Amino acid sequence: LAREVQAQLSGPGLAEFLRRMYGNHPDLWDAGLQGADRLRIIVNALTRLRFCTPEGRMDFDSTESAAQAPEGLVPWFDAPGRRTRGTLIAFGHWSTLGWISRPDILGLDTGCVWGGALSAVRFGATLAEREHCKVQCPQAQRPGE
C-alpha cells in the first residue's frame, strides 16, 4: 500500500495527488477502493490513524493517549481481528501514547517536540533483547508556546 502512495509522490501526478489527498473520508478500508479515495485512506491510515471503532472505522479527530480512548473507540493496534497482529509494527506520531513495546507493536514517539525524549530502539532476537535508547530534548517547544 505504501508503494502506491510512493509512486504518486515521485510521479508526474504529484500536484494533483496533493490537491486530492486531504480529508477524513473514506474512513473504512475496502480493498475495492480506487483512485483518490484509495490513496487518501492509505495516507490517513499510515500517518494519522490513532483510534478506530471495533469494526475498523477510522477516527481522525481524537489525539488522546490510548488510556484515554474516547467512548466507542480503541487504539488501532488493539482493534479486534487486526490482520497484522502477528507482525511487528514500529510506529510514531502519537506522543501522548509514549513508549510502548509489545511483541506486535513498538510505539517510538516519546514527545521530543514537546520536551520529552527522542527515542530509538536496537532490535535483538527476542522482545527481552530490545534496547530502548533515548536522548532528552530540553530545547523543545512546550505545548501552547
Annotated model-derived regions:
Residues 1-145:
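Feature recognizes metal-dependent phosphohydrolase scaffolds
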